[in-house]
């Protein structure tokens, strides 16, 4: 039986923050003090929620979105889970409905992760994932799949429909109580999924 890992992309597989930070700096925007503990982009840059959301959408639909680096140790362990343990990945990302943005995302993942991703599902920029997760959970092929996220609300939505949840830790979510495991990096995720618990991720 084929094994699946369903995962968010930005802040889990790819380092969206790094790419966005460089892009914002290029456009003359500076972060506020303590930005790393803020999830909302407006709060990070001292602007309104609407202004922040508009810039996120603009960035997500720019050419820059096709050149994001891997997050932490994602490249090594995603490929290892796919090539050694035969897991297939499904991306569920609130990137954009723009078809060119999706094509750039697929190309970015292919370049870094090879053939690990079987499918890339793009939702509207910043959209919640409840309905998409319910739809995936209704398909027998994804039964018992892992679900990896960095946004607690989305993690809980996946756990609620039956997926096994892992949250990637960041400054903005480190004090949040979650119904699932918390990983600091992909080595933690790899060890948990393969039950090689040398550095067991903690549950909170």
Predicted features by range, described:
Residues 1-52:
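Active-site neighborhood of HAD-like aspartate-dependent phosphohydrolases
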Residues 25, 82-83, 159:
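Anion (oxyanion) recognition and catalysis
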Residues 30-31, 39-79, 85:
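Metal-dependent phosphoesterase signature
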Residues 142-184:
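Acidic, Mg2+-coordinating phosphoryl-transfer loop and its flanking beta/alpha structural elements
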Residues 81-89, 117, 143, 163:
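A generic structural motif
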Residues 94-145:
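Substrate-recognition "cap/lid" segment bordering the active-site pocket of phosphatases
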Residues 65-70, 74-109:
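Substrate-recognition element of Asp-dependent hydrolases with the DxDx(T/V) motif
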Residues 120-124, 180-188, 192:
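Short acidic-hydrophobic, aromatic-tinged amphipathic segments that line or gate anion-handling sites
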């Amino acid at each position: 039986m084929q094994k699946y890992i369903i995962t968010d992309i930005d802040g889990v597989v790819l380092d969206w923050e790094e790419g966005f930070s460089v892009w914002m700096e290029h456009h003359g925007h500076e972060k506020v003090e303590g930005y790393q503990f803020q999830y909302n982009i407006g709060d990070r840059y001292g602007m309104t929620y609407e202004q922040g959301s508009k810039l996120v959408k603009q960035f997500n639909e720019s050419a820059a979105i096709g050149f994001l680096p891997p997050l932490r140790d994602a490249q090594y362990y995603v490929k290892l889970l796919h090539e050694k343990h035969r897991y297939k990945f499904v991306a569920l990302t609130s990137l954009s409905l723009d078809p060119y943005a999706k094509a750039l995302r697929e190309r970015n993942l292919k370049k870094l992760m090879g053939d690990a991703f079987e499918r890339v599902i793009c939702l509207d920029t910043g959209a919640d994932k409840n309905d998409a997760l319910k739809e995936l959970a209704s398909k027998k092929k994804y039964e018992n799949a892992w679900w990896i996220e960095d946004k607690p609300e989305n993690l809980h939505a996946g756990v609620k429909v039956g997926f096994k949840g892992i949250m990637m830790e960041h400054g903005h979510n480190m004090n949040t109580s979650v119904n699932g495991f918390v990983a600091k990096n992909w080595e933690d995720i790899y060890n948990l999924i393969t039950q090689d618990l040398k550095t067991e991720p903690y549950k909170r």
